[in-house]
Every structure is written in structure tokens, then in C-alpha cells.
């Protein structure tokens, strides 16, 4: 795949009502036209809140909108037939499809069980109370509406290591379940935040139970056969032992008919933690570049006071570009969400130019930046806020520019705190470009491109600058950009 470009084609507040799968089928041609060649679908299986579930409250991995469970047959995004039709339309347009894998926890159990638990200090999960409490917990998953179709596996308390609510006595908190697998405490090879960040929410899946790991491998084989997907996005891997995903990825790559694209979400702004995880899984997955996303957030808030020469310092794409999926926003960082770190709209064209037109990393585009989003929700202060996420003008042109002009050797001109630039040399087959941007006043860069680019007329593909720039016989010229803007200069004859 030339210049892979990923679209996250949903957001947290995408409307319910089964609209997404039909929308994707309808938009598939348009994705192809602008240069999107890979899409990340939201969790396609039934969540605990049924037709209202975003998908991260995972209930039944085998219900792709086919069974009357949790008050609905379709998921929030549509039914199984609509899902498969959307995937078919995307594939007809040579667009690879990634499925979202949420196997850290389950929610919405069908039955209670008598269980034994120990209280856990929420601020230091390594502190586990010695007292064992006899109680009941919602830990048994039988999926009665599915009635054993596709899988007869029954989840019970032996499949989980933790829970956040018990009954008889009724109590909320974090509790470690006592069973045959949890004697040593939490799983290892997870993030060390809060002492041990194995537990996140719901019924925490325990990967030390061999039957559980085999069931999740079986599900992967099943869902690949059902959907013919081309890869996976792995949710919340900082809470899942790295050894499990190394093993799981090895398995799915072995049984897949072709190599799968796999990217994991390890949300940490410490690049060392991301590199440690990559080492633990022996480089078998890419990771989203959370440090870079935070840099974009900070730069957009600071304006001209942000030193653009440092925009990639301490990021994964700088440290390990071959394992970095770069992004400007996602469903967790959008306003009013758990990891809220929005990038101001004025800066988004600059940020997208930096991930789409450079050679490093695989860029991910966020659905609302292409199509807009309007919603309201309650903030941390209890107040309700209306949110308007505008369409980012020229984003479709930047994506197209990636396919047409982001080729060849890259040279950086990061020599001014406000105005930076980079060039792509082009190849024998595809032309290159010069990208200039400023977070302050109007900017300019004098760039020597070499004799092969002598006496050429250049224009701004985005149309932000109206003048033409002509290189001298040695291929040197001064290229411009507006203040708080970006320009993509290309040879006029190739537009």
C-alpha cells in the first residue's frame, strides 16, 4: 500500500440509530477519491448498553448486530448485514478495514455468582487487603439469546481477576477476585500507573486462564472469517499483559491469509513506556503516538509562544518511526471525553500537514475533522456544554496531497521557532513538494532543492498563497506561508 492513510471513521458522540454502516458504504467511493486507503471501524459487536453503546463496554464479541441482546438486535452502528455490506463497499474501493478489539474487560453479565473477593486500594493497586469477603458478583456470561451459536464458551468468575461492584454486601470499589488464577495478584507486564494498572473497569479479563486466551484467539479466527478484515486496532493495551498480545498477534498473523495491519492504543505521554511495550511484544504492533497528540494540543493553545522546532521532540514518531501511527485527535481526546486534549481548529491544518506529508509514521485522520460533529455532554464540573467540531477546511486536499506529492527523500528546515518547513524530493514516478508553515506571522523559507528543480514554477496546492514561486537555475527559491497557516508548494505543471 502506497502512503497508507488511516481514517478513524467514528467519534464518541456519533448518533445512534444504525446509521454508520450504511454511511460508510455510501462514502467508500469518496474515501478512495481523496486518498483514504484504510479505515478503523468502531467496535462492531454488542456492548452492555445495546443500541446505545459506543462499543467499549464489551458484552458479546460474537454478536455483530445479529441477536436480540441488551434491548436491541443492531448495535449503535447497524446490524450485521449492514456491517458486511459496508466492508464489501470499502474493499471494492481498495480500502483496508481494521476492526476494534476490546478484550480488556466485559460488562453487562447475565447472571450473578457467589464469589470471594479482596478489597484493593484504588490509588495503589498493589495494596490488596488480606480479608476475603464472601459476596455475589455479576460475573457469569451465558449469552442466552445467542444460545451457543458460533461459540458455546461460558464466562464465569474464573475468567476474571477484578470487579468494581459486589452485592450481599453491596459495595462499590475495586476488588480482586479470588480464584485459581489470581493468587499472585494482578497480571504482570502492564502499566505501572497506580502501582499496577491491570484493572480498568467492569469485569477484568484474566489472561492467565488458558481457556480465556484460547477463546479470544478463536474469536479472532471467527471474526476474520466473518468479515474478511485486514487488521486490528487493539484497545487499552496498557491494562493487558504484553505477553498475551505478543502471543495473540503471532497467532492471528499466522492464520491470516495475508499480513495484517495492527495498531495498539497504549495511551501514555512518556515515550519510554511506548518503546518498552514495543520491545515487550517484539515489535509486532504499531502504537498511536500519544506524546505527539499532546504536543499538538499544547502548540494549538500556546500559539506563537510554542517552539515549532521542538514539535517532534519526545515523540514516538521521532524515536521509532516504523512503529508510530500519528494522529491529531481521537474519540478519547475530543472535548468532554476521558483523555480530553483537543487541538484548536486553527492549528489542525498544520498538524495534519506534519503527519500526512512527512515520510515518518502512518497518519490517522479523525472523522469529525473531515465531516464535523455537534453534540453536548456534561463536563467534569457537572455543567452541560454544547460542542461544535467544525470541518477542517482543506483537510481533504491535504490527504490528497499525501498521495500525490508526499514522495521521495525528506529534508527538514526546522530552524526558526515559528516558521518551519520540509521538502520531499519526489521520485522518478511521483512528484515531491515543499511544505512551509507558521504559528506566528507570515513566514518564508529559502530552500535549495538542487539543479533537477532549476527554473521550475511552483504554486501552493492549497491555494492559501496566490503568487507563483520560480526556482533559479540551481533549484533555489524562497517559499512563503501565511501567519497561522500552511502552504504546500508543488511544481505547477504536475497539478
From Swiss-Prot:
Main location: cytoplasm
Active site: 235 (nucleophile), 265 (proton donor)
Keyword Hydrolase: yes
EC number(s) per entry: 3.2.1.1
InterPro entries in UniProt: A-amylase_thermo (IPR013776), Glyco_hydro_13_cat_dom (IPR006047), Glyco_hydro_b (IPR013780), Glycoside_hydrolase_SF (IPR017853)
GO cellular component: cytoplasm
Catalytic activity from the UniProt record: Endohydrolysis of (1->4)-alpha-D-glucosidic linkages in polysaccharides containing three or more (1->4)-alpha-linked D-glucose units
SMART domains given in the database record: Aamy
Cofactor names: Ca(2+)
Pfam families: Alpha-amylase
Superkingdom as given in the UniProt entry: Bacteria
One BP term from GO: carbohydrate metabolic process
Disulphide-bridged cysteine pairs: none
One term of GO molecular function: alpha-amylase activity
Binding residue positions for Ca(2+): 104, 198, 239
Sorted UniProt keywords: Calcium, Carbohydrate metabolism, Cytoplasm, Glycosidase, Hydrolase, Metal-binding, Sodium
Family designation: Belongs to the glycosyl hydrolase 13 family.
Subunit field text: Monomer.
UniProt-recorded name of the protein: Cytoplasmic alpha-amylase
Organism of origin: Escherichia coli (strain K12)
Encoding gene per record: amyA
Amino acid at each position: 500500500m502506497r502512503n497508507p492513510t488511516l481514517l478513524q471513521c467514528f467519534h464518541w458522540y456519533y448518533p445512534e440509530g444504525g446509521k454508520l454502516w450504511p454511511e460508510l458504504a455510501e462514502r467508500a467511493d469518496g474515501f478512495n477519491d481523496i486518498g483514504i486507503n484504510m479505515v478503523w471501524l468502531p467496535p462492531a459487536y454488542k456492548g452492555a448498553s445495546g443500541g446505545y453503546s459506543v462499543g467499549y463496554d464489551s458484552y458479546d464479541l460474537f454478536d455483530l448486530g445479529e441477536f436480540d441482546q441488551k434491548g436491541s438486535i443492531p448495535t449503535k452502528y447497524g446490524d450485521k448485514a449492514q456491517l458486511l455490506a459496508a466492508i464489501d463497499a470499502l474493499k471494492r474501493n481498495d480500502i483496508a478495514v481494521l476492526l476494534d478489539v476490546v478484550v480488556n474487560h466485559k460488562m453487562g453479565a447475565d447472571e450473578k455468582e457467589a464469589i470471594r473477593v479482596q478489597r484493593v486500594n484504588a490509588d495503589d493497586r498493589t495494596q490488596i487487603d488480606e480479608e476475603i469477603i464472601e459476596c455475589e458478583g455479576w460475573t457469569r456470561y451465558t449469552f442466552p439469546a445467542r444460545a451457543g451459536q458460533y461459540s458455546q464458551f461460558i464466562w464465569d468468575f474464573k475468567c476474571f481477576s477484578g470487579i468494581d461492584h459486589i452485592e450481599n454486601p453491596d459495595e462499590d470499589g475495586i476488588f480482586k477476585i479470588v480464584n485459581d488464577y489470581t493468587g499472585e495478584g494482578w497480571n504482570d507486564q502492564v502499566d505501572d500507573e497506580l502501582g499496577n494498572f491491570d484493572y480498568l473497569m467492569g469485569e477484568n479479563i484474566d489472561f492467565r486462564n488458558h481457556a480465556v486466551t484460547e477463546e479470544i484467539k478463536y474469536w479472532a479466527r471467527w471474526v476474520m472469517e466473518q468479515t474478511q478484515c485486514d487488521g486490528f486496532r487493539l484497545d487499552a493495551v496498557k491494562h493487558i499483559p504484553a505477553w498475551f498480545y505478543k502471543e495473540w498477534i503471532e497467532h492471528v498473523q499466522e492464520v491470516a491469509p495475508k499480513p495484517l495491519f495492527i495498531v495498539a492504543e497504549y495511551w501514555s505521554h512518556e515515550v519510554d513506556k511506548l518503546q518498552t511495550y514495543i520491545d515487550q511484544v517484539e515489535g509486532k504492533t504499531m502504537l498511536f503516538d500519544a506524546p505527539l497528540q499532546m504536543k499538538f494540543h499544547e502548540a494549538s493553545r500556546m500559539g506563537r509562544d510554542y517552539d515549532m522546532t521542538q514539535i517532534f521532540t519526545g515523540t514516538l514518531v521521532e524515536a521509532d518511526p516504523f512503529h508510530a501511527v500519528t494522529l491529531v485527535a481521537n474519540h478519547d481526546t475530543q472535548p468532554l471525553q476521558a483523555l480530553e486534549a483537543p487541538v484548536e481548529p486553527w492549528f489542525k491544518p498544520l498538524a495534519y500537514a506534519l503527519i500526512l506529508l512527512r515520510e515518518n509514521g502512518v497518519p490517522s485522520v479523525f472523522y469529525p475533522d473531515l465531516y464535523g460533529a455537534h453534540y453536548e455532554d456534561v463536563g467534569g464540573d457537572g455543567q452541560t456544554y454544547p460542542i461544535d467540531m467544525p470541518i477542517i477546511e482543506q483537510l481533504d486536499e491535504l490527504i490528497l496531497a499525501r498521495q500525490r506529492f508526499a514522495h521521495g527523500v525528506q529534508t527538514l528546515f526546522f530552524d526558526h521557532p515559528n516558521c518551519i518547513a520540509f521538502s520531499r524530493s519526489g521520485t522518478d514516478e511521483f512528484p515531491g513538494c515543499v511544505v512551509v508553515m507558521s504559528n506566528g506571522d507570515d513566514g518564508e523559507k529559502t530552500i535549495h532543492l538542487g539543479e533537477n528543480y532549476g527554473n521550475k514554477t511552483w504554486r501552493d496546492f492549497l491555494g492559501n498563497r496566490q503568487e507563483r514561486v520560480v526556482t533559479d537555475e540551481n533549484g533555489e527559491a524562497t517559499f512563503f506561508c501565511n501567519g497561522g497557516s500552511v502552504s504546500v508548494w508543488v511544481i505547477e505543471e504536475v497539478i
